[in-house]
Amino acid sequence: MIAYKITSNKDFAGQLFKADTFDRFLLSEAVFNVPYTVSIDGTFSSGEETGNVSWGDVRGICMQLIKGKELPKSFHIVLKLSEENLSRTLASIDNNLDPSKVSGLFFNIRFEEDSFTLTTGTAVSDFQVMRTVNEAWDRLTLRFFRSKDIALEEL
């Protein structure tokens, strides 16, 4: 797990809320503190679909929550890799990794005090593979953000 400060709020907010940069990620949860608090559980509530909704499907709704003359007091958004991307990512880290031991790779995005921070996260059930997965996810996260021209500095 590693934490970064996003160095350009405007550019990052544009990529998060206006562009499709994160649309393939799944929403785990989001909480927006505007004049009121709005919590979004990223799981489907209908019986037809299961799992988590994609960020692309709720991005517009979330943008409406923060839009206005004043910045929101704070918000946090937790995005995770889809099952397909999780399997592919784990294979790129180490072909011998057992995917059943890793239930998620996450981005924790927080906006607070007019600043964005990003923290990587993993959900790993096997202590022996935890370090390998954590370090690789940190590297892959940095590579992804740099490929999207999102400037970061490590905290």
Specify the residue positions occupied by each region the protein language model found.
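A generic structural micro-environment signature
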Residues: 23, 28, 33, 87, ...
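Surface-exposed, low-hydrophobicity interaction/linker segments
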Residues: 49-115
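Mixed-charge, glycine-accented linear interaction segment located at domain edges/termini
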Residues: 120-155
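Charge-rich, low-complexity N-terminal segments
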Residues: 1-60
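General N-terminal targeting signals
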Residues: 34, 39, 44, 49, ...
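Acidic-enriched, low-complexity/disordered segments with a strong bias for Aspartate over Glutamate
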Residues: 11, 20-23, 41, 57, ...
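Generic structural motif
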Residues: 9, 37-39, 43, 82-86, ...
